[in-house]
């Protein structure tokens, strides 16, 4: 009977090890996904800042043109 208990325990340990290995793989995948999303976010932030600068430049040019029209 103790052999049966040892077999059951061994099976549960194997299942636990398999579960841990699967979870480790999932963690690695999630870390990679997180890194990719972080890079994408950083790229979008840079693009956003660039667009803000372009918008400011456009507004300044527009104000300048409107000022020239007012002077005419």
Swiss-Prot record:
**InterPro entries, sorted:** Cell_div_ZapB
Which HAMAP family has this protein been placed in? Answer: ZapB
Question: What does the sequence similarity comment in the record state about its family?
Answer: Belongs to the ZapB family.
Q: Which residues form a coiled coil?
A: 3-71
- The answer to whether keyword Nucleotide-binding applies is no
Q: Which UniProt keywords apply?
A: Cell cycle, Cell division, Coiled coil, Cytoplasm, Septation
> Localized where?
Cytoplasm
Q: Which GO terms describe its biological process?
A: division septum assembly; FtsZ-dependent cytokinesis
Gene3D superfamilies, per database record: 1.20.5.340
Assembly behavior: Homodimer. The ends of the coiled-coil dimer bind to each other, forming polymers. Interacts with FtsZ.
Biological role stated in the UniProt entry: Non-essential, abundant cell division factor that is required for proper Z-ring formation. It is recruited early to the divisome by direct interaction with FtsZ, stimulating Z-ring assembly and thereby promoting cell division earlier in the cell cycle. Its recruitment to the Z-ring requires functional FtsA or ZipA.
Q: What is its main location?
A: cytoplasm
Instruction: Tell me which GO cellular component terms the UniProt record holds.
Output: cytoplasm
Please report the organism this UniProt entry assigns to the protein. Answer: Haemophilus ducreyi (strain 35000HP / ATCC 700724)
Q: What is this protein called?
A: Cell division protein ZapB
């Amino acid at each position: 009977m103790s052999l049966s208990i040892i077999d059951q325990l061994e099976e549960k340990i194997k299942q636990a090890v398999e579960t841990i290995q699967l979870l480790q793989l999932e963690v690695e995948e999630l870390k990679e996904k997180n890194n990719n999303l972080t890079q994408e976010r950083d790229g979008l932030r840079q693009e956003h800042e660039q667009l803000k600068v372009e918008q400011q430049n456009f507004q300044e040019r527009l104000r300048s043109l409107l000022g020239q029209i007012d002077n005419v």
